Design a protein with these regions (language model features):
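Juxtamembrane loop-helix boundary motifs flanking transmembrane segments in multi-pass membrane proteins
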Residues: 1-4, 42, 184-191
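Membrane-embedded alpha-helical bundles of polytopic integral membrane proteins
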Residues: 2-164
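Juxtamembrane interface at the ends
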Residues: 104, 174-182
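Final/C-terminal transmembrane alpha-helix of multipass membrane proteins
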Residues: 198-214
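Juxtamembrane boundary at the C-terminal end of a transmembrane helix
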Residues: 211-224
C-alpha cells in the first residue's frame, strides 16, 4: 500500500506538471508554440526512446516508425496549428489523460479481473470502467464549462470510442515493450517512464479525432 501511495503521488505530481505546462502553452502562447512542443516530444521519442524498443538495424524499427509515432504526432501538430481544429486537440488530451489517470488509480485500488495479462498484467476490467467513468465526468464538466450542449447518448459514444482507442494504444505500446523486455520506454517522466509511455494512448486516439475532425468541430466549436 505504501508503494502504491508513493507511486500515485509521484504520478500525480508529474501529471500535474505536464497538464499545467501543456495548458499554459496551449492557451497563453501563440499557436505555433504548442506545435513546437509536440515536435520536441516527437524528437525525444525518436532519438532517445525508440531505440529502446528496437535495434537500429531491425526491420520493424523503420517499418513501424512512420506510422507510430510519426504519423499521430504529425496529425496532432497539424490540428493544433489549424484554428478550426485546435479545440479538438484540447478535448483529445482532456479525455485521454482523464481516462489514463482514473484507470490507473481504480485498477490499483479495486482491479481484480485481468484483461490481457500476458501483455499488460496491470490492465483490469475495473480499471477500464473506472477510467471510462472518469473520462466521461471530466469531459462533461469541460463542455459544460464551455457551455456546449450534447445529447447524452452521443457524449457516451464519443467518450467510449476515444477511451477504447486510447486503451488499444496503451496495449500496443505494452506489446512493444514486452517484446523488447523493458518496463518503460524511458525515464524522463518520474512515475510514468518516457514520453512514449505517457502519449501512447493519445497517439492512437488522435486518429479518431483526425478522421472525424469535421463532425467533431461542429459539436465542439467553442474556441479554447
Amino acid at each position: 500500500m505504501k508503494q502504491f501511495l508513493n507511486e500515485t503521488v509521484l504520478r500525480f505530481i508529474t501529471s500535474s506538471f505536464i497538464g499545467t505546462s501543456f495548458w499554459c502553452v496551449f492557451v497563453y502562447l501563440p499557436n505555433a508554440a504548442f506545435s513546437i512542443l509536440l515536435f520536441g516530444i516527437l524528437c525525444t521519442i525518436l532519438l532517445v526512446e525508440w531505440k529502446n524498443l528496437f535495434r537500429l538495424n531491425d526491420f520493424w524499427f523503420w517499418f513501424i516508425m512512420p506510422w507510430y509515432p510519426i504519423l499521430p504526432f504529425g496529425i496532432m501538430i497539424y490540428m493544433s496549428s489549424t484554428p478550426c481544429y485546435r479545440t479538438l486537440i484540447y478535448y483529445l488530451f482532456v479525455i485521454v489523460f482523464a481516462f489514463d489517470s482514473t484507470a490507473y488509480v481504480t485498477g490499483k485500488l479495486i482491479g481484480v479481473r485481468k484483461i490481457i495479462p500476458h501483455i499488460s498484467p496491470g490492465k483490469t476490467v475495473e480499471g477500464c470502467v473506472g477510467g471510462f467513468m472518469g473520462a466521461l465526468v471530466t469531459f462533461y464538466l469541460s463542455i459544460r464549462y464551455q457551455q456546449i450542449t450534447m445529447p447524452v447518448a452521443l457524449m457516451f459514444a464519443l467518450v467510449f470510442i476515444v477511451c477504447a482507442m486510447a486503451f488499444v494504444g496503451d496495449i500496443f505500446e505494452s506489446f512493444l515493450k514486452r517484446k523488447a523486455h523493458i518496463k518503460d520506454s524511458g525515464n524522463i517522466l518520474p512515475g510514468h517512464g518516457g514520453f512514449l509511455d505517457r502519449f501512447d494512448a493519445v497517439m492512437m486516439a488522435s486518429f479518431f479525432f483526425f478522421l472525424f475532425r469535421s463532425e467533431l468541430t461542429n459539436l465542439l466549436c467553442v474556441q479554447i
